[in-house]
Amino acid sequence: MNPSRSTALAAAAVLTVVASAAACGSNEPTKPKNAPGKPGGAYSVALTEPDHLLPGRTTSSYSLQVLQGLFDPPAALDPKNGSVKPLAAVSWSTTDNIVWTLKFRSGTTFHNGEKVTAASFADAWNAAAYGPNAWDANYYFAQIKGYDALNPSEEDAKPSARTLSGLKVLDETTLQVTLKAPFGQFPMLLSFPAFAPLPKAATANPDAADVAPIGNGPYRIDGAWERNQKIRLAKFTGYRGPRKPMADRVDFKIYTSRETAFTELQAGNVDVLTTVPAANSAQAKRLFGERFSIRPSGTMDYLGLPVKDPRFADSRLRKALSMAIDRKGITQAIYNGVYKPATSLVGDMIPGHRTDACGQTCAYDPVAAKQLFEAAGGFDGPLELHFSNADTTYEQWMTSIANQLKDNLGIQEVKFRKMAPADLSALLNEGKNKGPFRQNWVIDYPSIQNYLDGLYYPGNRSGWSDKEFDALVAKGNAAQGAEAIASYQKAEDMALRELPYIPLWNWQDQSAWSDRIDNVIIDPYAAGLHLDRVTVSD
């Protein structure tokens, strides 16, 4: 859900065998018009310090950018349209969306020379899914049969198993996966780096592999991870997968802020910045011309509401809050008009996105908002707004929202609760917040389901739940293609009627790069820059 994809597959009558998936949009990846250069050379990428480099231990977008070069998970997403295609796998098949058979490439090795087998994937997944390991990507494996035995719900209870019962190694290159329930999006899920394989050395000593990862991707780590300074990758000459690396070396330079990284890019001290600050968009466009891009993003910001608090229990009040917010004015003032005001629960690059799913609920209408607010009985007590200090713009737009709620609804007392990201996350997860909060969602794969499951999971931060909503999501999970999307859209409609999360705006990502490099492909669906495709011109 952090940092990082229509349904993955076309509907099939009996058997789904995947070698490629249906196109699902017209979003083109970012790349320059000049022709690719020759293989060789080195280039640098600006990055914020990752938290981990072991795939199952991280969901951070900063880590995932590095892992994109180090590991090949079973599947990948096409940067042109988000469709799913094999990567470390060569095919997958199912007859019921429950039992899946994965066939992997033969003749591939890890960076230490160990052969990559079906067991390498099973071992990695079991390690990530085992609750006591406390790996960050644990929940990505919750769809697989046996997950609950590895993650008992009772406090202090011990797991009754060490491995997922739904995994069965059939032979050296074949893995059978049994899910707990039908899930047609499963191949798309397999593109997430946590599903990459691990060698025996990594499962035996994950702490060592976390700082010196041993992957199966086109690049290997070169030297030590210099914390808060740099990470160097070198071409893996033994790579036998489908991604042929062009540059010999990739240097990740670590910066503490995007603003500093942008200054370094202007000075020629780094070659690629995939997160140009919104405030610098006009300057970046002027300086870099065709080497600057604004591309679609699946990332959304919401205002979450604690619906179990009696003050927020009435959906009319929640709609009044939404209609009192001037999304266009805020995005113009704070994000230079780069971010798009939300008209849906999901990003506009997502297959099945509807341009006006939210309707009048997301339209700025202070008069109608005040009428709804009064009909709902108004609001008692101070309104506390919760957000993190991770980005200065969060406080800026929360201040704008506070002023608009004061002016348009007459809520006079508003208090800010700004705190460190980890503290805010803990507060929200424990349900101890006393008011609305910033909720962000970064897609893992381009499906409406990813938003629905990510925002409205059992025990979610808003406290909202509905059995009919759950049934609609489950119906979509059991289907594929247009049938799945139709069920997910009905679930989205219900969530927008109840509005435990108020959609605010859809991010748009900005990137720029130096004239030293060509063939820059920045993926709106996955982990940013395609490291293997970049060529160096000098």
Which residues fall in each region the model found?
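N-terminal lobe/hinge region of extracytoplasmic solute-binding protein
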Residues: 46-96, 214, 503
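Alpha-helical secondary-structure segments
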Residues: 116-126, 172-178, 218, 247-249, ...
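Aromatic- and charge-enriched surface segment that lines or borders ligand/interaction sites
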Residues: 90-141, 176, 311
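Detector for C-terminal structural segments
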Residues: 15, 325-352, 393-403, 425-538
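Ligand-site clamp/hinge motif
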Residues: 204-207, 213, 238-283
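Surface-exposed binding/hinge segments that line
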Residues: 129, 133-199
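Structural transition elements
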Residues: 340-375, 389-396
